[in-house]
């Protein structure tokens, strides 16, 4: 297998990795490597769960593996795994800029620290990563890195995969982006000798993240304080609740509902939540996915078409009312990579304010 790392000078892209497509035999070997690795991690990660829960989680993993084999993306995952490892060895995190944070395979391979099953299997929606059974798609493998590790990437990939047989006339591509927070977090880790993990986040960190989000999207200090005090009364914080708040603020100008609706079960702040509700009301997965991705952004005649689609499946009135109000939604997996870095930064702000202030 051959690799080529292109550098796009003059813009934010570090450059894309191009690699020659492995032969069918090599692809099958890669798939087996990932399957064995994931099954090993599965047994260790969820041993505290009940036997029934373990079977459900195993079914979720097998569903992803089936999609991975169908889309022939095993080497995408293995290459992303090596990029994450070489970054971590150099003291820098990576940032998933696509939707890999929603993948169990990515979590088991160490590409992301976020477990997409941590809030329950009922809130895990592989359709946003892999599409539906009738319309399968590949994940978005865009990865953010610190510029310091770019020189190590080609060397690492060549040493790891140079012996893999491939078709030298066909190339696949993985986009890489230069991300400032990867560099900052690596520098903070080196200066403090500490590297936080998601298990280290507590209420102080989450409160700091919420304040940072508010501070970044509003100008008047008095308004910031009022909103911060209001939101503290609405919900308690964990990673999932902060994720919902972050998604809400990203779309704060795209609907008219107040912050009080964050605890309203009929108010959806992510595509995942809206999709789950549609499917629960017997809207087919393909149709529901189209509505939450394209329907919420549609206008005019196209919007009317989606309204008729909802009426066709006799969804409750509150869903139609919600749909009439929203014009855009983010999916959770698109927000996770960004939010993880916000939490890492907030952790340093709380525990090493002097070092953070010097770098910010």
Which role fits each region the language model picked out?
Residues 3-360:
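Noncatalytic, beta-rich nucleic-acid-contacting surfaces in large DNA/RNA-processing enzymes
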């Amino acid at each position: 297998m051959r690799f080529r790392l292109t550098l796009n000078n003059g813009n934010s892209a570090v450059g894309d990795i191009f690699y020659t497509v492995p032969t069918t035999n090599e692809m099958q070997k890669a798939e087996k490597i990932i399957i064995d690795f994931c099954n090993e991690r599965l047994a260790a990660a969820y041993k505290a769960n009940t036997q029934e829960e373990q079977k459900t989680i195993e079914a979720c993993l097998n569903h992803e593996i089936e999609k991975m084999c169908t889309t022939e993306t095993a080497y995408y995952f293995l290459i992303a795994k090596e990029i994450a490892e070489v970054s971590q060895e150099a003291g820098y995190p990576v940032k998933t800029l696509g939707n890999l944070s929603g993948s169990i395979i990515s979590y088991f391979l160490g590409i992301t620290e976020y477990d997409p099953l941590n809030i329950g299997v009922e809130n895990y929606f592989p359709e946003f990563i892999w599409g539906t059974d009738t319309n399968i798609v590949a994940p978005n493998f865009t990865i953010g890195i610190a510029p310091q590790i770019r020189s190590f990437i080609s060397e690492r990939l060549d040493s790891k995969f140079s012996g893999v047989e491939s078709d030298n006339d066909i190339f696949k591509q993985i986009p890489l982006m230069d991300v400032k927070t990867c560099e900052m977090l690596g520098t903070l880790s080196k200066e403090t000798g500490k590297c936080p993990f998601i298990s280290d986040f507590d209420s102080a960190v989450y409160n700091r993240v919420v304040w940072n989000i508010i501070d970044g999207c509003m100008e008047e200090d008095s308004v910031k304080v009022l909103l911060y005090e209001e939101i503290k009364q609405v919900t308690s914080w964990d990673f999932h609740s902060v994720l919902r708040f972050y998604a809400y603020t990203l779309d704060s100008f795209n609907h008219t509902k107040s912050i009080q609706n964050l605890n309203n079960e009929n108010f959806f702040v992510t595509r995942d939540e809206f999709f789950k509700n549609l499917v629960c009301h017997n809207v087919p997965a393909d149709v529901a996915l189209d509505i939450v991705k394209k329907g919420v952004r549609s206008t005019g005649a196209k919007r009317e078409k989606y309204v008729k689609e909802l009426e066709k499946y006799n969804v409750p009135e509150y869903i139609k009312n919600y749909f009439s109000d929203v014009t855009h939604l983010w999916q959770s997996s698109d927000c996770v990579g960004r939010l993880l870095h916000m939490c890492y930064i907030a952790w340093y702000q709380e525990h090493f304010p002097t070092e953070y202030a010097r770098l910010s």
